[in-house]
């Protein structure tokens, strides 16, 4: 096999270039097999080198062959050429060359063969070596197998040994466990033994201690025993010697012994001395040396110590310097600290002083605040007094109106349009400013109410006072009627100057007069009945259809149905709401103003509780709680309750907007509030007013307005026009109820709707009170005669019960102020109602401004003629309420609760007069008024007589005014509307002055605030007079301005004078004088507003 491979290699080697280089190597490596891979790899280097050499040799030889072939070819070409011989010769040469080349090639082949053979031999040797190696590897496999078998046996043996070891380990572990158990047992035994040993050791120690003690004792006893023995022996020897006696022998022996002893002592002493001297010398030398050494040592130590001392001294000096520096710094810091402490103490002192001063200032401010509050209360009281005076004047005016209307009915001429609306526009403008201030007052009242405590028992007292105040309101309404008549007379005079009344205004007064005539015709019993004659408000309650609301609203005045339904004009709420024009809701719904519950919420009208609660809901506690009446705000309200004028002031403050927009109050209240137009229908259909009144009546029964409305109920006209009756009661009660709600619930005044439209705030209250007033109206409507008498009796009871409402309803008086602020015409119809003294509050509410402008515009002469007596009566009444008010404010200051009671009593005092007047007026015509008089306190009977005479005078004056007012109304309305803005500005200025005057006067005394209020009132009067003058300006501006200036001067002087004098001035016969009285009334209204 190897030979074949070698031969193949030898043969194929030359041709390797043709077949490719590595065929030989491939074949060899392939044939070598797996066994010869290593040998091939090992000999690859030599083999490849040979292959390369062989290939190179072979590659050279073909070139030789190719060279020979090319030479022969060249010879062939030469021989074939034309020169054949030359070619032959050349061919011969080329053959030789070819032969030589071939020979050379052959020689080369031989050499190559030799080399290949040698190489083959070497390869055979390698192959043999490889075979040997393969055989050796087979032997190694066997060796490996043997070793593997041996190792496996060893592994088995080791496994067995391991198993044995595991068993041994387990046995050892068991032994260890046993040993541990034994160890534990031994440890326990050892511990026990140690404990026993310790116990024995302690016992041994104790025994040893006892033994030592016993040994000591024994030793002591032994010593004592030896001592005793020696002592005993000595005693025995002495005794023996004494017994034997001393012999001579013994003496000699003793002497010899003594001599011997002496000799021995001397020698001993000599020896001792010699020894001592030697010892002394040695000791001295030793001591000297010792001292010297010691001295040297000490000197060295001293030197060292001196160095240390020096360094220490230096350090000490340094430390001293540092200490001094520190001490100086410390002193400086102490000084700074002391200075800072001083500064701190000074600052603290200053701070404390500042705090004390601030506290003092706070206390002063508090005292000032309280004083201002009391002053405001006193001013409200003064305003109430003024309103009382105005109410008296209204009553007189109403009486005159009734007389005039009665005369007209008798004569038979148709009602002439009144210029009631003319004076009103001026007033509403004033009322707007009044509203602004009234809202502020209401806020103060609300604060005071918050401070007060609500007591149900007090509410009853307040109700009693409300009944009294209702009577006062009636009287005041009678006064307002008189004032309205005077105002109408003035308007007539002005109308003569300006005889261009708007058709609507002319129509409305005519309608009012017609409606009054109709009402009088309807309720001839009323006009005839002394009660009706006495209560011209009831006789005029149909006239209330004439109520300024309709008279004011020319549209309503045009609509005969509306004038016919005096309920609307009568409804003081309407008169109030016209004044409320500021409160668009009230202006829009004069019906609401009339019976806010009717127009605004029939449900409220239906729900007397709701009617009651508008103010009561707002401040039910206020309406209910005399404490609120007691509350400083209510202290003001009690004062207002005492003097409905003051109560009216908040309403007037609310009604300034109403006064500002008299036209709105006139027409907007009625035109805007179809409810009013509807309410006239209600006035027309007493059944309807009755139902709202019934719905409202529960509240009205509570409200003194009921007492007022019963009077209206007394008037058959009112029974006929229950709406009118309701409205007068409403006007009365709304005024009263509104004011109480407002006075009681400044929250209502605060309530944006109420604050915005104080008239509305009042009107909701009015809605409540109208309902109350309506309830008596319902009774009256049900049984005009019965309602008149029984309801009067009932309502007086209600009034007695309701006086709290009236006490609460100083704002009711306020709402009447709204009515007054609305239109003199409305005030006039209310005045027609006011003869009853029920409407006086309404007329007062209406007349705060309404009566004033009518007085200013219509006929100061009439006012002069009519009001002197009436005003005197009113002033007397006002003086009484003022006194009561003054008392009550003081009491309120002392105690918030007591003042309401006192206020109720005071109210009862002034109101009995008004109630007596009203009740007696009613008593003359009817017996029903008598129960009212009894319930209301049938105090003076003379006053009712006066009121009846005044009512007659008022009727006569109203008839005259109706004629003149028709002419004056159109011009006056325009003039008044122009005067409104000016009046508003003037009122605002006067109110600011009044507030300033109030603030400076801190005294708690009510008299001082009253004085301040009085000057403020003249200023307001001036503003109102200026308004009237402005209204007259189109006709007589220069003249009016001069008059206003004179009036202002007279008023500025007059404020300090008593209110009675003011009332007298208002009733003065001269126009100028009548204007100042009007100013006084206006001032009163403005004060109430404040």
From Swiss-Prot:
Comp. bias (Basic and acidic residues): 508-579, 595-633, 649-717, 745-781, 788-834, 843-964, 974-1090
SMART domains: Filament (SM01391)
UniProtKB keywords: Cell projection, Coiled coil, Cytoplasm, Cytoskeleton, Intermediate filament, Phosphoprotein, Repeat
Family: Belongs to the intermediate filament family.
Segments of this protein annotated with the region Coil 2B: 291-411
Gene3D superfamilies: 1.20.5.170, Single helix bin, Vasodilator-stimulated phosphoprotein
Gene: Nefh
Protein name per Swiss-Prot or TrEMBL: Neurofilament heavy polypeptide
Region (Linker 2): 287-290
């Amino acid at each position: 096999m190897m030979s074949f491979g070698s031969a193949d290699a030898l043969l194929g080697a030359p041709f390797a270039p043709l077949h490719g280089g590595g065929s030989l190597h491939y074949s060899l490596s392939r044939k070598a097999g797996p066994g010869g891979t290593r040998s091939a790899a090992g000999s690859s280097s030599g083999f490849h080198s040979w292959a390369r050499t062989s290939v190179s040799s072979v590659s050279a030889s073909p070139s030789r062959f190719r060279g020979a072939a090319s030479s022969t070819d060249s010879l062939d070409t030469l021989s074939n050429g034309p020169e054949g011989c030359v070619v032959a010769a050349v061919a011969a040469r080329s053959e030789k060359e070819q032969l030589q080349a071939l020979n050379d090639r052959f020689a080369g082949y031989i050499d190559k063969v030799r080399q290949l053979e040698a190489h083959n031999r070497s390869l055979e040797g390698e192959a043999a070596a490889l075979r040997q190696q393969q055989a050796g590897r087979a032997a190694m496999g066997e060796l490996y197998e043997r070793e593997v078998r041996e190792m496996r046996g060893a592994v088995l043996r080791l496994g067995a040994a391991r198993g044995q070891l595991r068993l041994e380990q387990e046995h050892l572990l068991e032994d260890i466990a046993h040993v541990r158990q034994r160890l534990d047992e031994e440890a326990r035994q050892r511990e026990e033994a140690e404990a026993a040993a310790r116990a024995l050791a302690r016992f041994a120690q104790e025994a040893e201690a006892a033994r030592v003690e016993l040994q000591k004792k024994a030793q002591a006893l032994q010593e004592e025993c030896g001592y005793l023995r020696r002592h005993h022996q000595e005693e025995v020897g002495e005794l023996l010697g004494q017994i034997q006696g001393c012999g001579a022998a013994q003496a000699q022996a003793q002497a010899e012994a003594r001599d011997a002893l002496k000799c021995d002592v001397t020698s001993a002493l000599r020896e001792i001395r010699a020894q001592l001297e030697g010892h002394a010398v040695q000791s001295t030398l030793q001591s000297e040396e010792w001292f010297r050494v010691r001295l040297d040592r000490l000197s060295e130590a001293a030197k060292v110590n001196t160095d240390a001392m020096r360094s220490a001294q230096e350090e000490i000096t340094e430390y001293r310097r540092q200490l001094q520096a520190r001490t100086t710094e410390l002193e400086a810091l102490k000084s700074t600290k002391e200075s800072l402490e001083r500064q701190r103490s000074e600052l603290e002192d200053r701070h404390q002083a500042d705090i004390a001063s601030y506290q003092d200032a706070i206390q002063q401010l508090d005292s000032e605040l309280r004083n201002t509050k009391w002053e405001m209360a006193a001013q409200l009281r003064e305003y109430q007094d003024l309103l009382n005076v105005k109410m008296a004047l209204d009553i007189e005016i109403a009486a005159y109106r009734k007389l005039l209307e009665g005369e007209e009915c008798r004569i038979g001429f148709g009602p002439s349009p009144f210029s009631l609306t003319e004076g009103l526009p001026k007033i509403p403008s004033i009322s707007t400013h009044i509203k602004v201030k009234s809202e502020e007052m209401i806020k103060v009242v609300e604060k005071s109410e918050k401070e007060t405590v609500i007591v149900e028992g007090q509410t009853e007292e307040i109700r009693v006072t409300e009944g009294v105040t209702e009577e006062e309101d009636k009287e005041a309404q009678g006064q307002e009627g008189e004032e309205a008549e005077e105002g109408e007379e003035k308007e007539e005079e002005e109308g003569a100057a300006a005889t261009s009344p708007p058709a609507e205004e002319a129509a409305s007064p005519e309608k009012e007069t017609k409606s009054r005539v109709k009402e009088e015709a309807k309720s001839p019993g009323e006009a005839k009945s002394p009660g009706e004659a006495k209560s011209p408000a009831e006789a005029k309650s149909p006239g209330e259809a004439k109520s300024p609301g309709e008279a004011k609203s020319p549209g309503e005045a045009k609509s005969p149905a509306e004038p016919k339904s005096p309920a609307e004009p009568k409804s003081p709420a309407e008169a109030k709401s016209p004044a409320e024009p500021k409160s668009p809701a009230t202006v829009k719904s004069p019906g609401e103003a009339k019976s806010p519950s009717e127009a605004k919420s029939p449900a409220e009208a239906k729900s007397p509780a709701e009617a009651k609660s508008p103010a009561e809901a707002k401040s039910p506690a206020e309406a209910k709680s005399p404490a609120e009446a007691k509350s400083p705000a209510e202290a003001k309200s009690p004062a207002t309750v005492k003097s409905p004028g003051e109560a009216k002031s908040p309403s007037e403050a609310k009604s300034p907007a109403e006064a500002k927009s008299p036209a709105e109050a006139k027409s907007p209240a009625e035109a805007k509030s179809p409810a009013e137009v509807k309410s006239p229908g209600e006035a027309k259909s007493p059944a309807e007013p009755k139902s709202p009144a019934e719905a409202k009546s529960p509240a009205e029964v509570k409200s003194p307005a009921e007492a007022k409305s019963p009077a209206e109920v007394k008037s058959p006209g009112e029974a006929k026009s229950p709406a009118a009756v309701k409205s007068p009661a409403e006007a009365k009660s709304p005024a009263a109820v509104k004011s109480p709600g407002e006075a009681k619930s400044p929250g209502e005044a605060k309530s944006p709707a109420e604050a915005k439209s104080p008239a509305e705030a009042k009107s909701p209250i009015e809605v409540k009170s109208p309902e109350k007033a309506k309830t008596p109206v319902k009774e009256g409507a049900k049984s005009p005669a019965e309602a008149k008498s029984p309801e009067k009796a009932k309502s007086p009871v209600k009034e007695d019960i309701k006086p709290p409402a009236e006490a609460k309803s100083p704002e009711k008086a306020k709402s009447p102020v709204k009515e007054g602020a609305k239109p003199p015409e409305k005030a006039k119809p209310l005045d027609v109602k006011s003869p009853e003294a029920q409407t006086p509050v309404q007329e007062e509410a209406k007349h705060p401004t309404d009566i004033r402008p009518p007085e200013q515009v219509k006929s100061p002469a009439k006012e002069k003629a009519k009001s002197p007596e009436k005003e005197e009566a009113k002033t007397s009444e006002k003086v009484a309420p003022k006194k009561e008010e003054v008392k009550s404010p003081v009491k309120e200051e002392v105690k918030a609760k007591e003042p309401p009671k006192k206020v109720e009593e005071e109210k009862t005092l002034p109101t009995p007069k008004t109630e007596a007047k009203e009740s007696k007026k009613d008593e003359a015509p009817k017996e029903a008024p008598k129960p009212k008089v009894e319930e209301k306190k049938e105090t003076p009977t003379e006053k009712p007589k006066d009121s009846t005479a005044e009512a007659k005078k008022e009727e006569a004056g109203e008839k005259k005014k109706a004629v003149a007012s028709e002419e004056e109304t159109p011009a006056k309305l325009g003039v008044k509307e122009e005067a409104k803005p000016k009046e508003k500005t003037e009122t605002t200025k006067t109110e600011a002055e009044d507030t300033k005057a109030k603030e400076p006067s801190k005294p708690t005394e009510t008299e001082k605030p009253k004085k301040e209020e009085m000057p403020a009132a003249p200023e307001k009067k001036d503003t109102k007079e200026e308004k009237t003058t402005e209204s007259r300006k189109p006709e007589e501006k220069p003249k009016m301005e001069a008059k206003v200036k004179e009036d202002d001067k007279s008023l500025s002087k007059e404020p300090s004078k008593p209110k009675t004098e003011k009332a007298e001035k208002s009733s003065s016969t001269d126009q100028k004088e009548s204007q100042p009285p009007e100013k006084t009334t206006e001032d009163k209204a403005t004060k109430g507003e404040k």
